[in-house]
Curated annotation (Swiss-Prot):
Span of domain E1: 46-205
GO annotation terms (biological process): axonogenesis; central nervous system development; cholesterol metabolic process; extracellular matrix organization; forebrain development; intracellular copper ion homeostasis; locomotory behavior; mating behavior
Keyword Iron-sulfur: no
Keyword Lipid metabolism: no
Organism of provenance: Rattus norvegicus
Protein name per its UniProtKB record: Amyloid beta precursor like protein 2
Transmembrane regions: 696-718
CDD domains associated with the record: JMTM_APLP2 (cd21709), Kunitz_ABPP-like (cd22607)
Residue ranges that the UniProt entry lists as topological domain Cytoplasmic: 719-765
Length: 765
């Protein structure tokens, strides 16, 4: 019956846990853990999880899981354990009724009142980081993710780190994201207080999480202690037993002296607050006027700032122990964290395990770097964004204002110098004039150089943004083509975005050329061929991308009209640009030559119109197979190699998309779209419409004529070669030849020909 009652109580507790889980995840996790403790203990209902706390020179403390209060060591002898294994053994001794399997350092420090020394009546309050005694199978904590905060986790099966190391890792990870650590927990235990991973919640630095009106007093204290923990130091490694004895005796002597002074004065013992970050209490923890706690028990931001200043302004202290532990301390004179050797005990709180953790705590001691107020400096120091053009205009205006200010100052100095130099000889006045002319020339040269740098930076950023947008649009377009079954509406939307991205690149190139043409015609004439080549490549790349639609003929026919409209709009812009170039009298000859390179517009008709009797449903074509196209990483459509191409390519059967102007682009092979059985009746007209422009047709004809000429010449040479072996001249006979060789030479002189060689020559023809 007792077992049945216990099982019923456990089932009832689990049901309550499930009901509370939807309301508050952390409370549910804690309730479930306490219920497990109660079931494991078998004696009463647990209200707290088992924990122990240590402070050298004082008796160890542990939590009474039935009352939730801290109690001293029952034997009255145990104090300051040396290793994590000893901590685990002590947990098992204190809680024999529980199945303690591991220990873990707590995330937050706690304030323990009335902490007494062994065989002494003197008691004080100390803030320490306790150890949790884990019961049964390890269960990770349930973390609450407030609004605007983010949840992360890290798992590294190849490493096994202690709790404090993971704490440092997650703090640095949040700082890297520009956020602060809100809460964290451990994952996958691999040893005593060692784990394979962690989970954590990061919140924005300006995020202030308001406590709920129904939050209990314990939860409020945990939040306040969490703020205090942000400035806490790493716990040191456990020292040796000899170090423990030396330091414990020193602490005992100090406490006895203090106790005698208090008894002589007859004053009551006043509890103070000592911070406990290392394994031991330092002699100088309260050297620099520790901040008194607030009357309401909370720690204000002012108190925290004062405590950080007191910590980070201390000098490095090795301590009385003789271990060799590389640590970091904040050097106030240098404004950065510097290495030093820690002895293993004592010392002060300016003691950190890593440089990043040191800087995270003491960064408020570094005076902030003044932000640049000049728009030009701001432009160069910030990366490109959607406001690139506006920031460029502001920087250019600021550059012009700065140049005018410098010129006005030099002009004013020049005028003052001329007034003072009226009575000087002519040679000296001439030298003065040359000096100021050189200054003006240098300022103009400097302004031109700064403006050139600004323009080049702007162009590079714009080109990079255009390339990124085009790449993303092309990837989406190819992904839409690869979908099974392909959706015409989605393909058309992706194609519109891709064509729009290409058009933005075209307009940017045109506007830049027109601007250079208006400012510097000579430079425009030099870059004109490059601009025309780039525009031609844009059109070829667009046509090659459109030609991929022949892999899905049903979709191509359905969106044919919309594609024609897109091409007509872009062709109108291109014709306007060509006409604007031709109107320039300086470049008429070049424009007329290069304008012929631009292929005439042909509406997009990839397939002949199908009759109503012909079935145009998707089952006529085979959809692209996943794994044969883009899905393959090595041979896929998008997984192709990157290459820098500096000249126009020829459109061959591989349909390679290229790029010029030293812009890295992806090269796509249309054969890899794959999975289709090409039909000559449908593929032929498409390639003729897309790849055979007037200039390309002339080039092909020239190549064909050249090939035919080579073939004819080769045939003529072969025909002559048949009779080329007959020689009617006199051949000198070598005196050392055998009679057979001499006879063969005579026969060849009279027209003899080996029939075997003649047969082989005829076979080659």
């Amino acid at each position: 019956m007792a077992a049945t009652g216990t099982a019923a109580a456990a089932a009832t507790g689990k049901l309550l846990v499930l009901l509370l889980l939807g309301l508050t995840a952390p409370a549910a996790a804690l309730a479930g853990y306490i219920e497990a403790l109660a079931a494991n203990a078998g004696t009463g209902f647990a209200v707290a999880e088992p924990q122990i706390a240590m402070f050298c020179g004082k008796l160890n403390m542990h939590v009474n899981i039935q009352t939730g209060k801290w109690e001293p060591d029952p034997t009255g002898t145990k104090s300051c354990l040396g290793t994590k294994e000893e901590v685990l053994q002590y947990c098992q001794e204190i809680y024999p009724e529980l199945q303690i399997t591991n220990v873990m350092e707590a995330n937050q420090p706690v304030n323990i009142d009335s902490w007494c020394r062994r065989d002494k009546k003197q008691c004080r309050s100390h803030i320490v980081i306790p150890f949790k005694c884990l019961v049964g199978e390890f269960v990770s904590d349930v973390l609450l993710v407030p609004e605007n905060c983010q949840f992360f986790h890290q798992e590294r099966m190849e490493v096994c780190e202690k709790h404090q190391r993971w704490h440092t890792v997650v703090k640095e990870a949040c700082l890297t994201e520009g956020m602060t650590l809100y809460s964290y927990g451990m994952l996958l235990p691999c040893g005593v207080d060692q784990f394979h991973g962690t989970e954590y919640v990061c919140c924005p630095q300006t995020k202030v999480v308001d406590s709920d009106s129904t939050m209990s007093k314990e939860e409020e204290e945990e939040e306040e202690e969490d703020e205090e923990e942000d400035y806490a130091l790493d716990k040191s490694e456990f020292p040796t037993e000899a170090d423990l004895e030396d330091f414990t005796e020193a602490a005992a002597d100090e406490d006895e002296d203090e106790e005698e002074e208090e008894e002589e004065e007859g004053e009551e013992v006043v509890e103070d607050r000592d911070y406990y970050y290392d394994s031991f209490k330092g002699d100088d923890y309260n050297e620099e006027n520790p901040t008194e706690p607030s009357s309401d028990g909370t720690i204000s931001d002012k108190e925290i700032a004062h405590d950080v200043k007191a910590v980070c302004s201390q000098e490095a202290m090795t301590g009385p122990c003789r271990a060799v532990m590389p640590r970091w301390y904040f050097d106030l004179s240098k404004g950065k964290c510097v290495r030093f050797i820690y002895g293993g005990c004592g010392g002060n709180r300016n003691n950190f395990e890593s440089e990043d953790y040191c800087m995270a705590v003491c960064k408020t001691m570094i005076p902030p770097t003044p932000l640049p107020t000049n728009d030009v400096d701001v432009y160069f120091e910030t990366s490109a964004d959607d406001n690139e053009h506006a920031r460029f205009q502001k920087a250019k205006e600021q550059l012009e204002i700065r140049h005018r200010s410098r010129m006005d100052r030099v002009k004013k100095e020049w005028e003052e110098a001329e007034l003072q130099a009226k009575n000087l000889p002519k040679a000296e006045r001439q030298t003065l004039i040359q000096h100021f002319q050189a200054m003006v020339k240098a300022l103009e040269k400097e302004a031109a150089s700064e403006k050139q740098q600004l323009v080049e930076t702007h162009l590079a950023r714009v080109e990079a943004m255009l390339n990124d947008r085009r790449r993303i649009a092309l990837e989406n377009y190819l992904a839409a083509l690869q979908s099974d079954p392909p959706r015409p509406h989605r393909i058309l939307q992706a194609l519109r975005r891709y064509v729009r991205a290409e058009n933005k690149d075209r307009l940017h190139t045109i506007r830049h050329y027109q601007h250079v043409l208006a400012v510097d015609p000579e430079k425009a004439a030099q870059m004109k061929s490059q601009v025309m080549t780039h525009l031609h490549v844009i059109e070829e790349r667009r046509n090659q991308s459109l030609s991929l639609l022949y892999k899905v003929p049903y979709v191509a026919q359905e969106i044919q009209e919309e594609i024609d409209e897109l091409l007509q709009e872009q062709r109108a812009d291109m014709d306007q640009f060509t006409s604007s170039i031709s109107e320039n009298p300086v470049d008429v000859r070049v424009s007329s030559e290069e304008s012929e390179e631009i292929p005439p517009f042909h509406p997009f008709h990839p397939f002949p119109s199908l009759s109503e009797n012909e079935d145009t449903q998707p089952e006529l074509y085979h959809p692209m197979k996943k794994g044969s196209g883009m899905a393959e990483q090595d041979g896929g459509l998008i997984g192709a190699e990157e290459k820098v191409i500096n000249s126009k390519n020829k459109m061959d059967e591989n349909m390679v998309i290229d790029e010029t102007l030293d812009v890295k682009e992806m090269i796509f092979n249309a054969e890899r779209v794959g999975g289709l059985e090409e039909e000559p009746d449908s593929v032929g007209p498409l390639r003729e419409d897309f790849s055979l422009s007037s200039s390309a047709l002339i080039g092909l004809l020239v190549i064909a004529v050249a090939i035919a000429t080579v073939i004819v010449i080769s045939l003529v040479m072969l025909r002559k070669r048949q009779y080329g072996t007959i020689s009617h001249g006199i051949v000198e006979v070598h005196p050392m030849l055998t009679p057979e060789e001499r006879h063969l030479n005579k026969m060849q002189n009279h027209g003899y020909e080996n029939p075997t060689y003649k047969y082989l020559e005829q076979m080659q023809i």
